[in-house]
Each structure stands twice: as C-alpha cells, then as structure tokens.
Design a protein with these regions (language model features):
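A gly/proline- and charged-residue-enriched helix-loop-helix capping module
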Residues: 1-12
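N-terminal secretory/targeting leader peptides
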Residues: 13-212
C-alpha cells in the first residue's frame, strides 16, 4: 500500500517512483535509568523527557507511551543528552546509535518507529522517453537494490546491536508481541494525524489494508 501511495505522490510531482533503498530502522535510546516496562503505557516513566522531531507523529507516540516529548534539532541531540537536558531520544537506527552516541547512552530499544530509507526516482519526462525494455531494466535494478538493502540492513542492524552491547550499552530484547503492541498504539494515536496531510480516504484505506 505504501509503495502505491508514494508512487502516486511522486507522479504528482512529475517523478517516476521505482522503489526504496532501506538503511535502517529507527529506535529509542536512553541515558541513565530505564523505567520498568519502558514500552508499557501504564508504567511510570518518571517524567523522562525524550527527544523527537517537531513532527506530531513521534510526539504522539512518546506521549502515548507516557514519556514527555521534547523537540531538539538532531545536531544538538548529543550535547542535550550528555548534559541531561533530555533523558533520551527517538530517531537513531542501531548504526547511528553506535557510531554517534555509544559513549553517552545506557540503553537502546530497537522499536522500529520509522524506516530510514532513500527513494529511488527518475524524471517522469525521462521515463516516458524510454522503451519498454529500458523501463523494465530500470525497474528490475530498483527492485534488486530494494531487496539487497533489506537483507543488508538486517545484517548490519544486528551487527551494530552486538557492537552496542560490547560497548556497554544494553540493547533491550523485543518480542513480536512487543512490536504488535507498539503497532496498535501507533494506529490508535499516530495514524489519525495523517488525515490532515493525506485526507480521510487515505487514512481509511491504510487502516483497512493493515488491519487484514
């Protein structure tokens, strides 16, 4: 469904969308003590302030989980975390958590809030000048990039989580039930915010598709 939605948006911009190049899944990092049951909305989060972007989506998720969301620019996250201005942050995949923050964080939760990815696009006008054979070649290559990026990301994410553990950062194990519970929290609290941007019809279609 998301592929089709992005393709429609790209088409409206005069672009031909061919696929995604995945680079990681965004998690949550915490400095200091981690609350008991950190992903249970009912547990006491002790007023922990977690950095998010200015987007209402991550703010809604953190609020639903019981944290206090704080907007901090990405280039200020390190100093804000180190100084105690914030207690943690949302938005780093495992590689980023290791490479940029391993010396100041104590916990990493691979919650998979969002996918870090690049979009593979070409000019719509250029696409229309191609033969069917050339278009097929581009589409095939884009699919290969997508498939390879998924496989590579799985390996790299695990490798970086192992490195985080070796560096003294505790990576919180998550079961499928944890991801299912988070997904439901997101559907209830974050997805309705999409209506203002994409409209009621898109929201209804998403809910129907992902509720199957």
């Amino acid at each position: 469904y998301i592929y089709g939605l992005v393709a429609d948006i790209a088409d409206g911009m005069g672009l031909k969308f061919l696929g995604f190049d995945i680079s990681g899944m965004e998690g949550m990092a915490v400095r200091g003590d981690l609350p008991e049951n950190p992903l249970d909305p009912a547990s006491d989060k002790k007023g922990l302030q977690i950095r998010t972007t200015g987007s209402p989506m991550p703010k809604a998720l953190m609020t639903a989980l019981g944290y206090t969301p704080v907007t901090v620019e990405w280039n200020e996250v390190y100093s804000a975390t180190q100084s105690g201005m914030i207690n943690g942050f949302l938005g780093a995949n495992a590689g980023s958590a290791y490479n940029q923050f391993r010396d100041i964080i104590n916990y990493y939760l691979p919650i998979g809030f969002a996918v870090d990815s690049n979009r593979i696009v070409v000019s719509g006008k250029f696409w229309d000048t191609m033969t069917a054979e050339q278009q097929d070649a581009f589409a095939t290559y884009a699919k290969e990039i997508f498939d390879e990026s998924i496989a590579q990301t799985k390996v790299e994410e695990q490798d970086y989580m192992d490195k985080l553990e070796a560096a003294g950062v505790e990576v919180i194990d998550m079961e499928q039930a944890d991801y299912d519970a988070l997904a439901q929290i997101a559907r209830d609290n974050c997805w309705p915010l999409l209506i203002d941007t994409y409209g009621q019809d898109v929201y209804d279609e998403m809910m129907a598709f992902y509720s199957k």
